Swiss-Prot record:
The protein, known as: CinA-like protein
Organism: Synechococcus sp. (strain ATCC 27144 / PCC 6301 / SAUG 1402/1)
Listed InterPro entries: CinA, CinA-like_C, CinA_C, CinA_KH, Competence-induced_CinA, MoaB/Mog-like_dom_sf, MoaB/Mog_dom
Domain of life of the organism encoding this protein: Bacteria
Family recorded in the similarity comment: Belongs to the CinA family.
Length: 421
């Protein structure tokens, strides 16, 4: 762990955060910013509008971090306690700042309002504090070092105001005061078709690296590995990451589909575009979800021709040429129907590839032999057609089944395109 004197801690003040009434987007923003600046931070605290509990949080944080960043509690109401609590914690008097009063009065005048006594509270800052101007609102922040090795920064809780103050004033101050001793450079590798535990087992030795570090994440069926290097420059960070990325890709093989802002749809689109090939889709249980993923990609009209949502068996028959006999014998949720759907859309639209999805998204409709979460994907291409069965389960709900099915369809197409290379 880094020297605590050079570590930051984010303290978010507001009962509305504790109650879950609003998301703590300020902490998310600041965490990302600190990472980009190369300032380590290991703790985040959320505390309600209570003087005693805020004092307790400050005392704990001041023992383990050298830069305490506060958001919220700078307003004019009695429950806005951040400034006065910090003054009490470090036995400092508050003094009214005339320049803040002037700024608030000017803003009130422009809005046709009159300065009230409670707004004067926002001009009270600890003696010796450096002002953090708030160009967008009436609550300024401050920077203060109450003792050696400890710096306090305060910001209003309004995200737009906080972000502007951070960017325009706080970040330059951090650079000028030698807080940004290195930068963090990251690379995000993306995987599909392998579980987080299986991938972690394959690459376990990499989790012990110190610089760069490797950390796994998983959501919505996708697994990610973030490689992060601390370096003096971006070029140095990229150089540290490159050999690790190469090794990880070699271990994962085709389970690694891309990096950073890549998506399965964008990767598939690039493969189709490079080959001059086209795609059409036929969807049942995903109800257009696959087409939506595809059409979010700019330029997808160059390789995606369209699709059919064949929710009813009559549509499967009339538009996709799925035979009534097959539907009667195998059922709509079957590999053979998925294959016929894929071939049907491929032939109807005249595309290189046809992809289909049919399944039981739930919560109803499952049976003992065909439970909720059972999905079949059909891939029809230049060399033939095949079907894939997936059992996602019912535990995570209908949307989960639909999302994973659309992602899996794209991944099966990606692998098919690569296999023809």
């Amino acid at each position: 762990m880094s020297d605590p004197r050079y570590c930051a801690e984010i303290i978010s003040v507001g009962t509305e955060l504790l109650l879950g009434n609003i998301l703590n987007s300020n902490a998310q923003f600041l965490a990302e910013e600190l990472a980009q600046l190369g300032i380590p931070h290991y703790f985040q605290t959320v505390v309600g509008d209570n003087r005693d509990r805020l004092q307790s949080a400050v005392k704990i944080a001041a023992e383990r971090s050298g830069l305490l960043i506060f958001t919220g509690g700078l307003g004019p109401t009695p429950d806005d306690l951040t400034t006065e609590t910090l003054a009490a914690c470090f036995e400092t008097h508050l003094a009214e700042r005339p320049e803040v009063i002037t700024d608030i009065e000017a803003k009130f005048t422009r809005r046709g309002r009159v300065l009230t006594d409670n707004n004067r509270k926002q001009a009270l800052l600890p003696v010796g504090a450096e002002l953090l101007p708030n160009p967008s609102g009436t609550a300024p922040g401050m920077i203060r070092s109450p003792r050696s090795g400890l710096t306090l920064m305060t910001f209003p809780g309004v995200p737009a105001e906080m972000r502007r103050m951070w960017t325009e004033t706080a970040v330059p101050w951090l650079h000028q005061n030698d807080w940004c001793r290195s930068i963090l450079v990251s690379r995000l590798l993306r995987f599909w078709g392998i579980s987080e535990s299986a991938l972690a087992e394959k690459v376990a030795p990499f989790f012990d690296l110190q610089n760069p570090t490797v950390a796994p994440y998983a959501n919505n069926g996708e697994v990610k590995l973030r490689i992060t290097a601390a370096a003096a420059s971006e070029a140095e960070g990229v150089a540290l990451i490159a050999p690790i990325e190469q090794e990880l890709r070699a271990i994962a093989g085709r389970d690694c589909y891309g990096a950073d802002n890549d998506s399965l749809a964008s990767v598939v689109g690039a493969l189709l575009h490079d080959r001059g090939q086209t795609l059409a889709v036929a969807e049942s249980c995903t109800g257009g979800g696959l087409g939506q993923l595809i059409t979010t990609i700019p330029g997808s009209s160059q390789w995606f021709w369209g699709g059919v949502i064949a929710y009813d068996n009559r549509v499967k028959q009339s538009l996709l040429n799925v035979s009534a006999e097959t539907l009667a014998e195998a059922g709509a949720v079957s590999a053979v129907v998925a294959e016929q759907m894929a071939i049907g859309i491929q032939q109807r639209l005249g595309t290189t590839w046809g992809v289909s999805i049919t399944g039981i998204a739930g919560p109803d409709g499952g049976t003992e032999t065909k439970p909720v979460g059972l999905v079949y994907i059909g891939i029809a291409g230049p060399t033939g057609c095949f079907g894939v069965e997936r059992r996602w389960g019912a535990e995570r709900g209908r949307d989960w089944v639909r999302r994973l099915s659309a992602g899996e369809a794209l991944d099966q197409l990606r692998r098919s395109l690569l296999n023809l290379t």
